[in-house]
Amino acid sequence: MDTSSPAAFVNGALLRRYIGQKVRAVIQVIRSDVGSVIGKSTDDQQIVVKGSPQPPLTTYLEVIGIAETDNTIRAEVWTNFGDSFDVQNYNELCKLANGEFRHLFI
């Protein structure tokens, strides 16, 4: 496992803390346009992901990339997470990874 450039676990609210840094987020795809995907974060905020994932897209995607603004990620890696995903648990993971247990996450 490459730990030289870790990606912070983020939801919509946490994204603004990491502008210019590598992040990972799970989104529910709302729509896909040329060069971007519009999605809903696990805390119900809209996120724009720049880039073009390989079709077909599933309902949930994990995106790893650089946070450009408080609601935009420039994607480097896209991973289909299927059509069913526990967004509440992932949202809690984001809170833990950015809170008192941050030291446990790369």
From Swiss-Prot:
Main subcellular localisation: nucleus
GO BP annotation list: DNA recombination; DNA repair; DNA replication
Pfam families: Rep_fac-A_3 (PF08661)
Residues found modified as N-acetylmethionine: 1
Top-rank taxon, per record: Eukaryota
Gene Ontology CC entries for this record: nuclear lumen
One Gene Ontology molecular-function label: DNA binding
Localization: Nucleus
Keywords for the protein's UniProt record, in alphabetical order: Acetylation, DNA damage, DNA recombination, DNA repair, DNA replication, DNA-binding, Nucleus
Coiled coil: none
Function: As part of the replication protein A (RPA/RP-A), a single-stranded DNA-binding heterotrimeric complex, may play an essential role in DNA replication, recombination and repair. Binds and stabilizes single-stranded DNA intermediates, preventing complementary DNA reannealing and recruiting different proteins involved in DNA metabolism.
Assembly description: Component of the heterotrimeric canonical replication protein A complex (RPA).
Entry similarity comment: Belongs to the replication factor A protein 3 family.
Name of the featured protein: Replication protein A 14 kDa subunit B
Originating organism: Arabidopsis thaliana
